Amino acid sequence: MSLENNGYHIVHSPLVKDENGVWRMNFEDMEKKIAEKHIHAAVFCSPHNPCGRVWERWEIEKAMELYKKYDVFVISDEIWSDLILEGHKHIPTQSVSEDARNRTVAMYAPSKTFNLAGLVGSYHIIYNTWLRERVLKESSLSHYNAMNVLSMHALVGAYKPEGYEWLDELRQVLTGNVEFACRYIQDHFEGIEVSKPEGTYMLFLDC
């Protein structure tokens, strides 16, 4: 992986299921590993890939309090944030506190939502001036995956009112598809557990 090739070590903190079968962050494990491994940057996936959890505000706040305590920079992968199933709401990581706003690089793209993968149309939001300048400096040294004219127009077009109208219809269809798929798997696939996602269009199966 590119991170490891650049001398970084990846430390995982697996999710755990609560008494209701809902996947949660293991805050005790997160803090232990941050402290013991001297972690200074964290990748925060919201909504979560692959289990499809759409984090509640208190969960994001608690994670960001840990990152603040140990001065950890946060890369918030929010590429699935448009695809929230009915009954749930995405909370942007940068919105939960002023500190979260300033220590987080939030990453987005229309590729998952509007089927534009491959056009290289991702973008990030950075409020912290110092952090933004560092990212711009490093990215200016390479043209790898730079946006092009086609991807720029595709991104602008996706986020027009017509795109949002289409997305509202898509979310209704996906919600119905998820309901059907989860019921079918539970009824026909003995020994396989399925976690009903709150966002994304993926199903997380425990085989």
Predicted regions and their residues:
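Active-site PLP attachment segment
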Residues: 96-134
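Helix-loop "lid/cap" segments that line or gate small-molecule binding pockets
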Residues: 119-127, 152-161
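Generic structural signal for small/hydrophobic residues in well-ordered secondary structure
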Residues: 3-4, 42, 49, 77, ...
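Glycine/threonine-rich helix-loop capping motifs at alpha-helix boundaries
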Residues: 139-148
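Substrate-binding/gating loop at the entrance of the active-site cleft, primarily
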Residues: 1-10
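Active-site phosphate-binding strand-loop segment of PLP-dependent enzymes
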Residues: 15-89
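Conserved glycine-rich beta-strand-loop-beta hairpin in the small C-terminal domain of fold type I
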Residues: 156, 172-182, 193-207
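Structural signature of PLP-dependent enzymes
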Residues: 133-140, 159-182
